[in-house]
Amino acid sequence: MNNLYFEPSSSTPLVNFCADGRLLIEGRSLPENVTEFYTPLIQWAAMLKVEVVRLDVNLEYQNSASSKKLLEMFKVLDANNNIKNLIINWHYEADDEDALESGQIFEELLRRAEFRYHEYSEAA
């Protein structure tokens, strides 16, 4: 299985998915065509064949369409029988309660994923 890498843009996040189970989504997610952007990520997640997955999500902004596709991808990872341990590291800015709440909502909707919350302060 090949790694999956997308350079970030002003409207799409950095994606760095390694076949060894280290996954990263970082930046802003408001693509013009959310289905076109997230479909390769979801398909890749469905084919992943590792026992431990560590997904770091560090999104400074995500629109509602992106949130729906993220949930779809999380559910695919959660249902992937090859994965025995799914850890989602949810990074959020200290004063961004909405971002924290988004992670908590995702966590409630998944069966097996272990969410770990990481608060950070924006550098001055």
Regions found by a protein language model. Name each.
Residues 36, 40-42, 54-107:
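Amphipathic alpha-helical interaction surfaces in cytosolic regulatory modules
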Residues 45:
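Extended lipid/amphipathic-ligand handling interfaces
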Residues 14-15, 81-89, 113-124:
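Short flexible/disordered coil segments
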Residues 2-39:
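STAS-typified acidic loop motif
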Residues 96-124:
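A generic hydrophobic-segment detector
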Residues 22, 53-54:
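Structural motif
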